[in-house]
Amino acid sequence: MQTHEIRERFTNHFVNAGHTAVPSASLILDDPNLLFVNAGMVPFKPYFLGQQTPPFANGTATSIQKCVRTLDIEEVGITTRHNTFFQMAGNFSFGQYFKEGAITHAWTLLTNPVEEGGYGLDPERLWVTVYLDDDEAAEIWEKKIGVPAERIQRLGMADNYWSMGVPGPCGPCSEIYYDRGPKYGNEGGPAVDDSRYLEIWNLVFMEFERGEGTGKDSFEIIGELPKKNIDTGMGVERVACILQGVENVYETDLLRPVIDVAETLTGATYGRDNTADIRFRVIADHSRTGMMLILDGVTPGNEGRGYILRRLLRRIIRSARLLGATGETMEKFMNTIMDTMTPSYPEIAENRERILRVAITEERAFLKTLVSGTHLFEEAAASIKSSGSTTVAGAQAFALHDTYGFPIDLTLEMAAEAGLEVDVEGFESLMAEQRSRAKADSQAKKHGHADLSIYREWVDNHPTVFTGFEELESQSRVLGLLSDGTRINEAAEGQEVEVILDQSPLYAESGGQLGDRGRILMGDTVVDIQDVQKIGKKLWVHKAVVANGGLAVGDEVVAAVDKQWRHAARQAHTATHLIHAALRQVLGPTAVQAGSMNKPGYLRFDFNYTDQLTPEQLNQIQAITNEAVDTDWAVNTIETSLEEARAMGAMALFGENYGDLVRVVEIGGPFSMELCGGTHVEHSSQIGPVALLGESSIGSGVRRIEAYSGLNSFNYLSKERALAESLSSILKTPSTDLPERISQLLDKLKAAEKEIATLHRRELAAKSEEFITGAEEINGIRAVMVRVQDGLDAGDLRTLATTLRDKLSNGEGLVVVASRSEDGTKVPFVAGATKQAVARGVHSGNLIKLIGSYIDGRGGGKPDMAQGSGSDIDGLDAAFNAVRAELENL
């Protein structure tokens, strides 16, 4: 039975029973807390919460809702159970029928013969679960429907009780499972093996109201609802698997055609290799989800829903390339999935061209960078491995993201495939820095206001006269005051204000140099200037706080620059010019400035260059810069025409738009000559020492040098010298020999760590018999639960757990071992169970989750082996007691 027919039969069944057919809502709802619709009942929430009256004639409705869940994108393809898009068929009753009606409707549709409009499932292969205390539902299933008692299983709140996770409606639920047969797992119903027994329908009986609480089973039931409601959800894809007789959703009529096309495009074959199969499934799943997101108006972007779509599309592209595709593939994938989905969603036809355009555009943009980005990553990975490291630096991950458009998720995926980890914290730090810069740039452009028209009168009629090249104090008049973007006539003490003056000696931020700090003075009035921004290259806006007294429009005042600020800012700006000149001497004329930022005592200089600078090159640049400082060259400024400046050899930077009259800053004749409107020292010696802090890559072909100047540089070098002297004293080694001495110590440390690890393993092996001898007998299960010595990692614990489990393999046995990291911040723990214990019902993964809840940790795994990590070692005894209680209850 084709999927579109499964959908039609569902809708017809409930419409014939008096339900109103409700079309699927968009995947995008006007809910800021919801990325995508992720459950069939989401569009009906206002009715269940009592916020709106259900508009349906009989108080009942049915829908087949398209849903997207993207929390586990990385799991897609690894197993056949994860899908990012699915269809949830549901029927809903608002105060009409309740348990018996919901159960009867579901059973009838599932088991009625195909010729009578049902799905024709064998009743003998259907199992049901009910909530532990829901005798009513159990009785309906057994007495009314005729399901044998042995195929009705009772489960707890975690499995068979529903709520929205917040105070509001809740209630028990009953789930219907299909027995796929012995080749899929153990008999005994869904409580024993959910791999064999496939959940196909969940019936939620909303009859109570819950209170506060977290988790699935840690809240109080505070009363009954005035009306009892029904919310059910049947997985369309799961029913399709059964009715089409296939192993999983990837084999159904919805997704298998995409895999077939992928085989043709790549030359690979599905079903022969697990790694290749994962990529085939990624292509199939993500093609459908991506297409449906585009259908509902999502476009690729760098945030929110757009980022999810971009991530999905790029995973398709990369998976196809890894399978062997050499050209564009998106058009064929999208056309194929649209063909399979159009019978269920006819609106796809009228949006076909748009969907293709969005997907193909994204593919072409990404393909331009995928090859080079992948090559860059592979080079980095090879270098990392050859150095003995296992971590991709945050800066490398950031470069992939910032330069090649690789989302961090893709870098994480590539790293995992290469057996590497990623310094995510370092990446996030660089991202935060980038966002901070972008925000600062945006604020500088907007000058604090989205609407700059408020400055228009002053820009046109009263541009600021800048006197700061000639003097540090000016007699000025207050032309205007603004507060929160609104013009005011006067400002009181403590008020933040923007001040417009007729003339000002304070430099307004531009050309990479931050605005001056200073004061506005008038009698007892003191106004602290915290920043100066420029509007339209003509108007200086002084952002300030009235520290004492008051200020009014028309006041005659003194505007004064903070002399220390200006001096240190001039040092940094002139040092920037010297470093640029030194760079070009060392690296050649292609090392052209791409951006800069300088403030008192510090500068950041970006330049076009592809390779990482060597320590020798950095030393050369620093030496040439300080030689220029020591030479005490005059720093001259010349105002001339742009043509004349270029004829002189002055460098114009950034692709800026210059006026007819420009300012040239010349240092040491031909050594440095640039167009610049900033403030500078009179002689290069006034800069003081310049200390390079290092260099890094900030993008494709762009690198950055950071440096201190003046007093900051002196303080930095003093600290470096003190550090070297301290190390020399501690290691009893001359400072010139420190690198060799430290290298020797590191070699010894590595050897010692290796020896300690060997001793640890021997000690653990010796203790294993002691642990076995001390095993507890709990409900027939021999359990070893111990905290071993500090410093063991998860790998050590896993080895120990495996050894101990093997020693218990002749019966029902459980092992739980835990340690604590040397710094005391982490608590790794591992659990392992013998085959006999697993058959008894022991599940190591579940026990790991239980332990994690006591020690502020998390983890999981398989029934026979699982691991986790926490942080609170003090909770370990309570965690072990909880495990004992679980074993007692088996």
From Swiss-Prot:
<dbReference type="GO" id="GO:0006419">
    <property type="term" value="P:alanyl-tRNA aminoacylation"/>
</dbReference>
<keyword id="KW-0479">Metal-binding</keyword>
<dbReference type="Pfam" id="PF01411">
    <property type="entry name" value="tRNA-synt_2c"/>
</dbReference>
<keyword id="KW-0030">Aminoacyl-tRNA synthetase</keyword>
<keyword id="KW-0963">Cytoplasm</keyword>
<dbReference type="InterPro" id="IPR023033">
    <property type="entry name" value="Ala_tRNA_ligase_euk/bac"/>
</dbReference>
<keyword id="KW-0648">Protein biosynthesis</keyword>
<feature type="binding site">
    <location>
        <position position="680"/>
    </location>
    <ligand>
        <name>Zn(2+)</name>
    </ligand>
</feature>
<dbReference type="GO" id="GO:0005829">
    <property type="term" value="C:cytosol"/>
</dbReference>
<dbReference type="GO" id="GO:0008270">
    <property type="term" value="F:zinc ion binding"/>
</dbReference>
<dbReference type="Pfam" id="PF02272">
    <property type="entry name" value="DHHA1"/>
</dbReference>
<keyword id="KW-0862">Zinc</keyword>
<keyword id="KW-0436">Ligase</keyword>
<dbReference type="GO" id="GO:0000049">
    <property type="term" value="F:tRNA binding"/>
</dbReference>
<dbReference type="InterPro" id="IPR009000">
    <property type="entry name" value="Transl_B-barrel_sf"/>
</dbReference>
<dbReference type="Pfam" id="PF07973">
    <property type="entry name" value="tRNA_SAD"/>
</dbReference>
<feature type="binding site">
    <location>
        <position position="573"/>
    </location>
    <ligand>
        <name>Zn(2+)</name>
    </ligand>
</feature>
<dbReference type="GO" id="GO:0005524">
    <property type="term" value="F:ATP binding"/>
</dbReference>
<comment type="similarity">
    <text>Belongs to the class-II aminoacyl-tRNA synthetase family.</text>
</comment>
<keyword id="KW-0694">RNA-binding</keyword>
<keyword id="KW-0547">Nucleotide-binding</keyword>
<feature type="binding site">
    <location>
        <position position="577"/>
    </location>
    <ligand>
        <name>Zn(2+)</name>
    </ligand>
</feature>
<keyword id="KW-0067">ATP-binding</keyword>
<dbReference type="InterPro" id="IPR018164">
    <property type="entry name" value="Ala-tRNA-synth_IIc_N"/>
</dbReference>
<comment type="function">
    <text>Catalyzes the attachment of alanine to tRNA(Ala) in a two-step reaction: alanine is first activated by ATP to form Ala-AMP and then transferred to the acceptor end of tRNA(Ala). Also edits incorrectly charged Ser-tRNA(Ala) and Gly-tRNA(Ala) via its editing domain.</text>
</comment>
<dbReference type="InterPro" id="IPR012947">
    <property type="entry name" value="tRNA_SAD"/>
</dbReference>
<dbReference type="GO" id="GO:0004813">
    <property type="term" value="F:alanine-tRNA ligase activity"/>
</dbReference>
<dbReference type="GO" id="GO:0002161">
    <property type="term" value="F:aminoacyl-tRNA deacylase activity"/>
</dbReference>
<keyword id="KW-0820">tRNA-binding</keyword>
<feature type="binding site">
    <location>
        <position position="676"/>
    </location>
    <ligand>
        <name>Zn(2+)</name>
    </ligand>
</feature>
<dbReference type="InterPro" id="IPR018165">
    <property type="entry name" value="Ala-tRNA-synth_IIc_core"/>
</dbReference>
<dbReference type="InterPro" id="IPR002318">
    <property type="entry name" value="Ala-tRNA-lgiase_IIc"/>
</dbReference>
<dbReference type="InterPro" id="IPR045864">
    <property type="entry name" value="aa-tRNA-synth_II/BPL/LPL"/>
</dbReference>
<protein>
    <recommendedName>
        <fullName>Alanine--tRNA ligase</fullName>
        <ecNumber>6.1.1.7</ecNumber>
    </recommendedName>
</protein>
<dbReference type="InterPro" id="IPR003156">
    <property type="entry name" value="DHHA1_dom"/>
</dbReference>
<dbReference type="InterPro" id="IPR018162">
    <property type="entry name" value="Ala-tRNA-ligase_IIc_anticod-bd"/>
</dbReference>
<dbReference type="InterPro" id="IPR050058">
    <property type="entry name" value="Ala-tRNA_ligase"/>
</dbReference>
<dbReference type="InterPro" id="IPR018163">
    <property type="entry name" value="Thr/Ala-tRNA-synth_IIc_edit"/>
</dbReference>
